[in-house]
């Protein structure tokens, strides 16, 4: 109910609104800002379908149900639980032509530092990563590892769909780390300008 009081401003820098639904994409959002992303996707991109990576923990169960209500499937896994299996399932979703959404610093952080899974997934699938940023005019902060944002009722939500980020193939650990940092920097640039 409270979500209906929010006002939105959308900045589609990645031209995702005009991207064919036959072209799969990876959406990446920081963990502390993901709460209303399912509603944003339902409202602004209702024709896109796919799956979201949700923590295999008990806390992830209610998020998985919310994601399913807006038309996305839930792939359960994380860096500490069923991580490899989850990445392979997400790659299958992309191979079938659907999108995936990931919080690359979740479920335990550290905040604003992406893990390796999204890089492996982008390399394996060839799908571009679209950074997504949600900024709230008024919010509460939860005392959690990532200081999770809860938008206050009647606040303004600025949604930025960043430009597509293509992750290059790598053959060394150093090159892989460079790709990880390049994507992390692209995501952080949206946070820093807000």
What kind of feature is each model-predicted range?
Residues 1-40, 154-156, 182-194:
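Membrane-anchoring hydrophobic helices of lipid-metabolizing enzymes
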Residues 23-81, 141:
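Catalytic core of membrane glycerolipid acyltransferases/transacylases, capturing the structured
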Residues 58, 80-83, 107-114:
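Acidic, metal-coordinating catalytic cores used for nucleic-acid/nucleotide bond scission
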Residues 77, 103, 131-134:
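Generic beta-sheet signal
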Residues 89-121, 125:
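Catalytic-site beta-strand/loop segments enriched in glycine and acidic/polar residues
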Residues 113-172:
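A cross-family acyltransferase "interaction/gating" segment
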Residues 163-167, 171-173, 177-192:
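C-terminal functional extensions of proteins
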